[in-house]
Amino acid sequence: MTAPSMIREYEISAQSTAVFGRVLCSARNHHFIVDGPVQNGCPGEELTPPEVFLSAVGSCGVELVHVIAKDEKMPVESVNVRVRGIVDRGNQPRTDVTTFTRVELDFVLTGVDQKQATALVEGFKRR
């Protein structure tokens, strides 16, 4: 039996639309709209790129905590995470791109005790 690969590759496409600042994104056979923020003159009606990024981090956290709980046979009932991202343009770690200077995750788990919840979140951090 072959061991699973340590390398995973993902691909999406993004293309402009007839609406300024609105982008059509596709992943596999799924499509969704992303808007630039209002301060850039964009519609700002849909999720913005930073919100999509933070949503991806949050959904990864929820899904992986459930997977780890299942593997460890822990009775987690629900996993909620609040993700907050900060972009401090005056304190960027790099000069070639603008990045989040801080991303905070706050997990709330039910069905497990504090020790189990901590172990599950730590397991997510190591993934």
Task: List PLM regions with ranges.
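Extended beta-strand/beta-hairpin segments
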Residues: 1-55, 66-127
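Alpha-helical metal-binding/catalytic segments enriched in His/Glu/Asp
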Residues: 60-61
